[in-house]
């Protein structure tokens, strides 16, 4: 297969980090948005739910369009949509207008994930692809975590409007840069692949294992993003910490995530621990973190604690969970599509859309149970972690049955 041009790793990185960094920057301003529009915090949080639904729709459709029309034009189209919707968000006069703009923004920015992954697969194969992903992995964990700090400083020294000014400027710079230098990597643009797409869709609909993997990935990412949409109300609104200080606190989670990523690599490459055992260890870390989080949350409801102690009682369990998150999720993504090797692009877009719908559902639940304390969210985290562990056990049972046949 002839490659038209390889995409450099730094271009992939800019695509990959755009969406998660956008969301972590935005969530720092949720309390400010709530006060500005004079609405309940739970309503403000639903803007993130719509964001993930828009993202799911983008993954499902834009990835497919890039197979037909090429990666470069669809990537540029997505960035253009991202910029326009960010500009519209600046002038939102009510929460409904902002919700629509956020949905469209997510639809556009989804090219960072779906087109970025497609371009990576077009440009690199085998061990070279693994090396590119491995070299980018620490940055993919580190840079989005800076988003809370960036958002915190923007909110503290200006207003939520300037969050979208920031998105508009960064999006415009990326669009101009990529218009000049982004290569086309799809060497076999094909206008007649719809039959294959629907064939894969029919198989996926019946694939119980894939649905269970989608639930696990969606649940764990739902916990991650759910924390970022709930925590600002607890720390900024209730504990009265500054927006910038909250951003620094949220940044601590990145170190736990990076540690989990390096621990997984060490166990697999240096200690030759089987991938499935690493996944099991990830569940153990997650369960321990979520159980401790739930216990601490209910203790904080009945016992008065200093701000420093309360912060530690919330962040330490989440850091433990994040270690588990990054032991588990990379392995889950690897195994989920193992039976779809010949149609990874098509299957990946459908699979990604499914688990982003799960993330949207989790963030919607977070908005519905929003309260003045963290206990409701902590209980949800515990339930999701237990449910994911049960799903993993069901996958193991289904694999055993499959191999017996």
Swiss-Prot record:
Stretches that traverse the bilayer: 3-23, 42-62, 73-93, 95-115, 135-155, 162-182, 209-229, 248-268, 280-300, 309-329, 346-366, 377-397
Highest taxon, organism lineage: Bacteria
GO biological process assignments: xenobiotic detoxification by transmembrane export across the plasma membrane
Similarity comment: Belongs to the major facilitator superfamily. Bcr/CmlA family.
Chief site of localization: membrane
Annotated GO MF terms: xenobiotic transmembrane transporter activity
Annotated protein name in UniProt: Uncharacterized transporter RF_0358
Gene Ontology cellular-component annotations: plasma membrane
UniProt feature coiled coil, ranges: none
Organism whose genome encodes this protein: Rickettsia felis (strain ATCC VR-1525 / URRWXCal2)
Organism ancestry: Bacteria, Pseudomonadati, Pseudomonadota, Alphaproteobacteria, Rickettsiales
Protein location: Cell inner membrane
InterPro entries: Efflux_drug-R_Bcr/CmlA, MFS, MFS_dom, MFS_trans_sf, Sugar_transporter_CS
């Amino acid at each position: 297969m002839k490659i038209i041009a390889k995409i450099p790793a730094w271009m992939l990185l800019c695509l990959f980090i755009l969406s998660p960094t956008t969301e972590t920057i935005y969530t720092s301003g949720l309390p400010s948005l709530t006060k500005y529009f004079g609405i309940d915090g739970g309503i403000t949080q639903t803007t993130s739910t719509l964001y993930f639904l828009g993202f799911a729709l983008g993954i499902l459709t834009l990835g497919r369009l890039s197979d037909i029309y090429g990666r470069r034009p669809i990537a540029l189209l997505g960035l253009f949509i991202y910029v326009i919707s960010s500009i519209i968000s600046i002038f939102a006069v009510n929460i409904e207008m902002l919700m629509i703009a956020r949905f469209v923004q997510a639809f556009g920015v989804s090219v960072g994930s779906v087109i970025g992954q497609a371009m990576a697969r077009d440009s690199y194969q085998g061990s070279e692809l693994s090396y590119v992903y491995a070299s980018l992995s620490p940055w993919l964990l580190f840079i989005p975590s800076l988003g809370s700090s960036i958002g915190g400083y923007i909110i503290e020294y200006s207003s939520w409007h300037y969050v979208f000014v920031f998105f508009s400027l960064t999006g415009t710079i990326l669009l101009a840069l990529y218009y000049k230098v982004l290569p086309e990597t799809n060497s076999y643009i094909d206008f007649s692949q719809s039959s294959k797409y629907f064939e894969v869709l029919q198989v996926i609909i019946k694939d119980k294992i894939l649905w269970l993997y989608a639930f696990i990935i969606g649940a764990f990412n739902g916990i991650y993003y759910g924390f970022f949409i709930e925590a600002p109300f607890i720390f900024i609104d209730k504990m009265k910490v500054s927006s910038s200080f909250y951003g620094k606190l949220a940044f601590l989670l990145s170190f736990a995530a990076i540690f989990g990523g390096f621990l997984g690599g060490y166990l697999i490459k240096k200690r030759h621990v089987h991938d499935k055992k690493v996944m099991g260890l990830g569940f153990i870390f997650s369960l321990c973190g979520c159980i401790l989080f739930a216990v601490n949350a209910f203790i904080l409801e009945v016992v008065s604690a200093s701000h420093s102690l309360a912060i530690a009682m919330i962040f330490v369990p989440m850091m433990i969970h994040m270690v588990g998150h990054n032991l588990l999720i990379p392995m889950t993504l690897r195994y989920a599509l193992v039976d779809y090797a010949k149609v990874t692009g098509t299957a990946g877009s459908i699979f990604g859309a499914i688990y982003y719908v799960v993330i949207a559902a989790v963030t919607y639940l977070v908005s519905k149970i929003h309260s003045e304390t963290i206990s409701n969210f902590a209980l949800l985290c515990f339930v999701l972690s237990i449910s994911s562990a049960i799903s993993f056990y069901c996958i193991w049972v289904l694999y055993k049955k499959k191999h017996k046949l």
